[in-house]
Amino acid sequence: MNALRYGLTPKMKPVSPRKSALVAALDVGSSKVVCMIARLRPHAPQQVLTRRSHGIELVGFGHTVARGMKAGCVANLGQAEGAIRHAVDAAERMAGVEIESVVLSLSAGRLCSELFAAEIDIVGSAVSEHDIARVLAAGSRHSLRDGRAILHSLPVGYSIDGVGGVRDPRGMLASRFGVDMHVATTDIAAARNLMLAVERCHLEVEAMVASPYVAGLAVLADDEADLGAAVVDMGAGTTTLAAFLGGRLVHTDGFALGGHHVTMDIARGLNARVADAERIKTLYGSVMCGGSDERDMITVPPLSDDERDQAQLVSRATLVSIIKPRVEEILEMVRDRLANCPLAPDARSHVILTGGGSQLTGLPDLAARILGRQVRIGRPLGIAGAPDVIKGSAFAVAAGLLVYPQAAHLEHFEARRKRQLMMGTGGYFARVGLWLRESF
């Protein structure tokens, strides 16, 4: 929690490519809380997932209905704590271990991205690890804004004497060495309260990670991440997105619309209980009408407990007419947010949908029409021992949290003491001025 005082979310030490590790993932969403415990074992690179240094064997799994959460934010601390304890306890019992820390996802807090560039002098010598650390520090030092916390600080690419496109600059001769840095941030209040709920369960937050980023780590093959793809995680209370290009995260965004809003539309449109609306959405939800939808009828239980009230019958076509407008609204917002990606259109050449909201029948076709891109449903890759229930798109974020320790080495964060110097009272532009004076 102390790190958030300086605008930093916790970051974990990368897992050694030569050592095994036990990792616990915690995905606290608006509709469900999921805890997964896995053993990471070093293995030879695979053909599809060449960037993964470890195999992932799931040994523990627990999930429960989320309580005290709204749009990914903590709304009731005690209820959220209780749900987290329940999911963690189930996973620990299955794994036969007691965990002390978790890798935690975050989908709330108005996720957003910014790109920064910086250059330093090398004076004609070869680029060293120290030079890389210097230029990364210069690129990230001025990225904090009041009320925001850094989730990710990732180099997008390097330049040597003004020539970009350099992936690995080590050992190259240069006079000027530059970096393009992608920084993803969130509202500090959303991060702080979610961490507090976890810490009240006597668990340390080892790392906090943006939900769409880890969803991408779970469902993208290496070629997709290299050539450019956008992952859209459609949760209950939020829809978040992440764009990948050149194997790197280059953009994140999110907004507070999701599957729960579809459920509420059904409840209002059919005059049904929320629980019945959720069940109807799960069993019959679709965004495309079929030839028999006008004739196929769905039973809707009465809203009250009065025995005199009778269940009503509605057609599948009526249900589609309620669901489709809201889903179109969500997809149109996704389209507009992706259009703002500075590296568009390369980073969104095709779209992968994850999350519980992606399970509506006909959604890939509707999304392809609205987004103007190839669309598929993303499912976690390379998780051994996973039961069928968690092989679907609804568990992509939790599965990606198990992959994240293998990608943690890509991130840059300054020492906490240095970062604290940038948190004075001068505001954002004053900090930029200070960065300019220090770096040039």
Protein language model annotation of sequence segments:
Residues 104-109, 349-359:
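Glycine-rich beta-strand-to-loop/alpha-helix junction loops that act as flexible
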Residues 240-242:
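A structural feature that tracks compact, well-ordered secondary-structure segments
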Residues 221-223, 356-370, 391-392:
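Short glycine/threonine-rich loop-to-helix capping motif typified by GTGT followed
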Residues 346-349, 379, 392, 398:
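Hydrophobic multi-pass inner-membrane translocation pores used for secretion
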Residues 334, 353, 401:
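Hydrophobic, well-ordered secondary-structure elements that form the walls
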Residues 1-230, 248-249, 259, 272-320, ...:
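Nucleotide/phosphate-binding catalytic cleft detector across ATP-hydrolyzing
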Residues 332-350, 360-377, 406-411:
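ATP-binding/phosphotransfer module of carbohydrate and carboxylate kinases, centering on a glycine-rich
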